């Protein structure tokens, strides 16, 4: 485990009702849901920002649950979570598109099995609006899909969201409602006596929580081991995606892949093409077993294989349109299902583990159940009341690129910084960057700003705007420019001034 460089006593002696370990989509959504009660909630995340691992390194698809077996926790929570997405994203002011999913079939011999499969998904598994559509209908909706597709299984409930944007929004709303998010805070060990966690040692002091929620992703098994309650193992699985330039977005408006109904491996998800919430196309991911929990290196073979496979979905796909690529590490158990339950040996522990795809989709529903479980556990020691002042609404930074000329002019007259263009590719203004740095959960790094308002997400990948973003961070925070980091750790952009320090 890569640990933060910070060593201090900022959290020494803290006694929260609930300590949430992990700042991914699971931990952040649970923290927000917990604030519906009058509870002291502390979320500890070892990285310099939330959504730094799997929650910031996935394709952003909101799954309808077509491919999940009945009776699993995954299937139960994906159905419930999918239905909650419209309301959640509206409350948190996060872009969300319910664009539909197409699974194309190449052989007429699979038509009857496809009909039976769609009916089984719809009527037995509760995956609403699952049906078979003709090739003619498919090409009318998505004209660039492979003309060899004879028909497709379609579901209208699939959607696309920005995964790190939603995680940040969850965390910000939790903070707005009174939660504390401690970044650069790693759990090192636990003091467990008589089947109860008495204290949790971090690099920032010892914490004394009433209960602990383990939402630590690939490290959930390590936290469980510290708590003396490990009954599952995580076997990390890498997945690589490529992001295409927005000009390629015209190739498809929804989510698509091609499949065969022949039985394949038990790996979750087989990759596809996603029209993202920000109008790029995303190609992938693949699924490769690994023993390294934090190896986010991207292999050329993964990109090649993803494109080779998905050119069966859209023949016009071209690697020349790639603007960047990334790899995430999933956290499956060997049972390939979620672990959402109270500790079996440790009384004041809740596990939220084994969260792999479709964990982004399931997060709202999982958070609701875990928060109720936690509130009930805390109520054993003292009364827990509803938080009457809870506010579910979070207003994001105004998105200049989505405004009409009239709306832009009105905003610029009120806030001149919104008239200073910093990122040309994504049309991001100085005002948006300043507001991101003044948000409920500000992160004063170039990547922190990038994840919040998208400078550097376009074709040039920050080649033009990165120095300007760094200057704005320096200006807003008052720190020297050479102290500004790209991300966490020692990722400094500069090493000092030139010409004897006068900067000229």
In which residue ranges do the predicted regions lie?
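Extreme N-terminal leader/targeting segments of oxidoreductases
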Residues: 1-18, 36
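N-terminal Rossmann-like FAD-binding beta1-loop-alpha1 element of flavoenzymes
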Residues: 16-43
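Flavin-dependent oxidoreductases
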Residues: 29, 190-196, 202-284, 288-297, ...
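Dinucleotide-binding Rossmann-like beta1-alpha1 core, especially the glycine-rich loop
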Residues: 60-141, 270-271
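Short beta-strand to alpha-helix junction loop
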Residues: 74-79, 107-113, 153-172, 295-301, ...
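Helical element adjacent to the flavin cofactor pocket in flavoenzyme catalytic cores
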Residues: 154-211
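C-terminal catalytic lobe of FAD-dependent flavoproteins
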Residues: 268, 294-421, 428-441, 457
